[in-house]
Amino acid sequence: VTRTVEPAEWADMGVPLLASPREVVKDLHARHLPSPPTAVVAAYDPDGRIRASASFAFRAGVVDGWERRNALLSHLRRVIPHDLRLRRPVRTAVLMVCRDGASGWTSEDGAWMWGLRDACTLHGLRCGSYVTLTRDGWHVVGENRAGRTPNAAHHAPADAASGQPQPGRQPIRSASAR
């Protein structure tokens, strides 16, 4: 059984487009300062504001979406309650994977995409965009939107690396902190 999604299948799924992908990538990068291999999953409210996010290191080379889904579900459950009680999902999950290698699609990306889609179904979220972050820059799979910065080689400012909130940014809160 192959638990992976090809780019064409992803594009046909009707994943909602990011209104401002550059801002989403910059914000997630600034909040989590990912370096390879790190995944950042975020849940967005209908108004486009980030509700919760989590980042975690992952084992490279995994091409089975089952493992990726389990990791995503584990981290989503820690930062935001499920929305399974709703008839339709209102929050959208976005996944940014910071990895080594070329910026093009890989079978690992396919496993992440399958995992994101399934984790969203099981957590009551809409499946949102899948973004890769490499040394070449970022790329939103299925949308053909990309940029050079931030990238996997981009170093954070000293105050951000210290763990202090950056001026003008709200610290990330889990949904239970409300």
Show where each model-derived region lies.
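Short, solvent-exposed loop/turn segments at secondary-structure junctions
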Residues: 101-106
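Short glycine/proline-enriched loop/turn "hinge" motifs that connect secondary-structure elements
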Residues: 84-89
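Divalent-metal-activated hydrolytic enzyme cores
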Residues: 34, 111-178
